[in-house]
Regions:
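Conserved SAM-binding strand-loop segment of SAM-dependent methyltransferases
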Residues: 57-68
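A short SAM/SAH-binding and catalytic strip from SAM-dependent methyltransferases
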Residues: 76-94
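Conserved alpha-helix/loop element of class I SAM-dependent methyltransferases that forms part
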Residues: 2-18
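SAM-dependent methyltransferase
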Residues: 107-164
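Conserved small/polar residues in nucleotide/adenosyl-binding loops
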Residues: 173-180
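A short acidic, Gly/Pro-enriched loop at the edge of an enzyme's catalytic core
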Residues: 69-77
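Conserved SAM/SAH-binding beta-strand->alpha-helix loop
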Residues: 46
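A short glycine-rich, Lys/Arg-flanked "PGG" loop and its adjoining helix->strand segment in the class I
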Residues: 95-107
Length: 180
């Protein structure tokens, strides 16, 4: 856990109750939570990731999509770390995402999500930022994984800036944001 970034370590320490690790990958966060004595369910859509989690000793790894309606358990903490916002795919999926969170998150529960703001990619030498406001949201990316000659299918991935995420969170939940 000490080799993890401070944001991840803090989220793991703050996670309480029944914890859902979304997009768990190899299970590094789930294993750290288990070592801390916490109850964690780790989900991923990759059969290989779930197999790796099993081999590494994750207690409750599952092959399931967060948006699969048959997955109806509830949790006190939902972790979406390491650019976990990506699974939302597109900005127009935010309402569906927050509706889903309302169904699986216990009242008073927490979602810990991180994302990179890609605005820096559009920064000019003078410090100004040039973004095509008529185009798609600048954090919507078409991803494709490749290893040597093997290419996967393309998929949508969302990097969302803090302000945009906050606006959606307030619009679709009962959250209030602190004022400065």
């Amino acid at each position: 856990i000490q080799s993890m970034p401070i944001l991840e370590r803090t989220a793991l320490q703050m996670a309480t109750g029944r914890i859902l690790d979304v997009g768990a990958g190899s299970g590094c966060h789930a294993l750290a939570l288990q070592e801390m004595g916490k109850n964690v369910c780790a989900i991923d859509i990759s059969p290989l990731s779930v197999e790796v989690m099993k081999q590494r000793g994750v207690n409750d790894p599952r092959l399931i999509n967060l948006f699969d309606e048959t997955f109806s358990e509830t949790f006190d903490t939902i972790l979406m770390l390491m650019n976990g916002s990506g699974i939302i795919g597109r900005l127009n999926n935010m309402p569906e995402f927050f509706q889903r969170m309302k169904r699986i998150l216990h009242p008073g529960g927490c979602i810990f999500m991180d994302s990179s703001d890609l605005r820096y990619l559009f920064e000019e030498e003078d410090g100004s930022i040039v973004i095509d406001l008529a185009g798609d949201y600048y954090g919507e990316i078409d991803f494709q994984m490749q290893y040597k000659d093997v290419k996967g299918d393309t998929f949508d991935w969302l990097y969302v800036d803090f302000q945009t995420l906050s606006l959606y969170a307030v619009s679709y939940t009962h959250l209030t944001l602190p004022t400065n």
